[in-house]
UniProtKB/Swiss-Prot annotation:
Name listed for the protein in its UniProt record: Holliday junction branch migration complex subunit RuvB
Originating organism: Synechocystis sp. (strain ATCC 27184 / PCC 6803 / Kazusa)
Induction behaviour: 2-3 fold induced by UV light.
Listed SMART domains: AAA
Extra information: This bacterium is considerably more resistant to UV and gamma irradiation than E.coli; the E.coli-like SOS regulon model is not an appropriate model for DNA repair in this cyanobacterium.
Organism lineage string: Bacteria, Bacillati, Cyanobacteriota, Cyanophyceae, Synechococcales
Region (Disordered): 1-41
Consequences of knocking out this gene: No visible phenotype; cells are more sensitive to UV-C light, H(2)O(2), CdSO(4), SeO(3) and SeO(4).
Length: 361
């Protein structure tokens, strides 16, 4: 059931403020329209077509049906978890299910209050505003969101000093969907204003296999179920990586003039791209090797590892560490990062004894 739109934000023509004059900055197209359309086609459009995240889907299904029954907007939703697990896709699915628009932006793009103000005033009843990397919102922008989320009201300060006045503008009832890889970095006032807070987990191999088979069908790629499974096993539990690896294996099969992707061909291709059987790439192995060879397995601080590898500390923490922690190759303690026995064995090295001193009896 679609939500009725009023399309009126009750703005007075006499209100003049920088906050009400958002600049429209044209963005360069980084990819061709055909490529963008293809990428969009890989995303499922409805909740029933979304593979994986079973518990989360049930929570969202109930929220959608309840909101439709009351003809209301869905409560504000915070999605958190490692990158590439489908947070943006879920926001688009919510909009499709609710038959409303979805406006997509990222916190770093909302540098000035006028940026978020323009977005909020343009929203119609039921619309979804998706903010990626929401933990990176600056203080002023975040404070503007508080009354917007809670009371659907925008408070704007007119003038300066003692003559300053606060004018409140009514907003359409909308849904804010925030996405973050660092939920602990959100302030309590912002986090507490989300009615739904849901975590996305890494995907199982069989779920990634289904995603790869679906993507292969869309891209007209011939692949066997076992070939899809071989790619899924190296996809780090992440759909975005699974689709990327499929495209690289597709290129390899095309050049090698192979009509179908099977496990042997997939392994050959991914070995060429230095993606091993657990999905670790060159940088993953570099982090583990550096920790083991230069720091005797740890414990070692993140900055020290970053300096030794030449990688950005934030990149290591947000891109590489989550999967290494998930598969048990890395441990984080109050003293720093530690390579586990499994990491030594994966790299073909003999772990020291005892590897983890705190486990000694």
């Amino acid at each position: 059931m679609a939500i009725k739109r009023s399309g009126n934000n009750n703005l007075s023509p006499n209100v003049k403020s920088d906050l009400l004059s958002p600049e429209v900055i044209p963005q360069e197209r980084s990819t061709s329209p055909e490529l963008e359309q293809q990428e969009a086609s890989l995303r499922p459009q409805r909740l029933a077509d979304y593979i994986g995240q079973r518990d989360l889907k049930e929570v969202l299904r109930i929220a959608i049906q309840a909101a439709q029954g009351r003809q209301e907007a869905i409560d504000h939703l915070l999605l958190y978890g490692p990158p590439g697990l489908g947070k943006t896709t879920l926001a688009l699915i919510l909009a499709e299910e609710m038959q409303v628009r979805c406006k997509i932006t990222a916190a770093p793009a909302l540098e000035r209050p006028r940026d978020i103000t323009g977005l909020l005033l343009a929203l119609q009843p039921g619309d979804i505003l998706f903010i990626d990397e929401i933990h990176r919102l600056n203080r002023l922008t975040e404070e503007l969101l508080y009354p917007a989320m809670e009371d659907f009201r925008l408070d704007i300060t007119m003038g300066k000093g003692q003559s300053a006045k606060v004018r409140s503008l009514k907003l359409a009832h909308f849904t804010l969907v925030g996405a973050t890889t660092k939920v602990g970095s959100l302030t309590s006032p912002l986090r507490d204003r989300f009615g739904l807070i849901q975590r996305l987990r890494f995907y199982e191999v069989d779920e990634l296999q289904q995603i790869i088979l679906r993507t292969a069908g869309i891209l007209s790629v011939s692949i066997s179920p076992t070939g899809a499974e071989a790619i899924a096993m190296r996809a780090r539990g992440t759909p975005r990586i699974a689709n990327r690896l499929l495209k690289r294996v597709r290129d390899y099969a095309q050049v090698k003039q192979q009509p179908e992707i099977d496990p042997a061909l997939a392994s050959e291709a991914l070995d060429l791209y230095q993606v091993d059987k657990r999905g670790l790439d060159w940088t993953d192995r570099l982090v583990l090797q550096t920790l083991i060879e230069q720091f005797q397995g740890g414990p070692t601080g993140l900055e020290a590892i970053a300096a030794a590898t030449g990688e950005d500390a934030k990149t290591i923490e947000e891109v590489y560490e989550p999967y290494l922690l998930q598969i048990g190759y890395l441990a984080r303690t109050s003293r720093g990062r530690i390579a586990t026995t499994a990491a030594y064995e994966h790299l073909g090295l003999t772990p020291p004894t005892p590897l983890l001193p705190w486990k000694e009896s």
